[in-house]
Amino acid sequence: MSPIPAKVTAIEKRGLQYQVVVEIVPKYRGSFNTIVFGEFKPHSGSLKDGRLNLVYYQNPGLNIGDPFPLWTLH
C-alpha cells in the first residue's frame, strides 16, 4: 500500500450524519474502491476531482486542517 497525502477541508453535521470533505492530491487517478481508510472508516463516500465526500454516523473526531490517513492499494 502507498500513502495518499490528504487533509480535512470541511465538516458539517446534518441531522444524525456528519459530512466530511477531504482533499487529496489532484494527481491521484485511482477510484474510491482502491482507497484504504485508517481508523476513520466512513459509512459511505465518493471521490471526484481530488475531493472525498464522506458520510459518518458518529462524530469522527476530526477538525478542519487535520491530516487524514489514507492509502491506495496500487
Predicted regions mapped to residue ranges:
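Short, charged beta-turn/beta-strand-edge "cap" motif at the junction between a beta-strand
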Residues: 58-60, 71-74
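Short coil-to-beta transition motif at edge beta-strands of beta-rich domains
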Residues: 65-68
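Acidic, low-complexity, intrinsically disordered interaction modules
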Residues: 21, 26-62
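Short coil-to-beta-strand transition motifs
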Residues: 1-7
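Short aromatic-glycine-enriched beta-strand elements
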Residues: 15-21
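Residue-level recognition of beta-strand microenvironments
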Residues: 11-13, 27
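Short, exposed beta-strand/loop patches in secreted or surface proteins that constitute
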Residues: 9-11, 42-46, 71
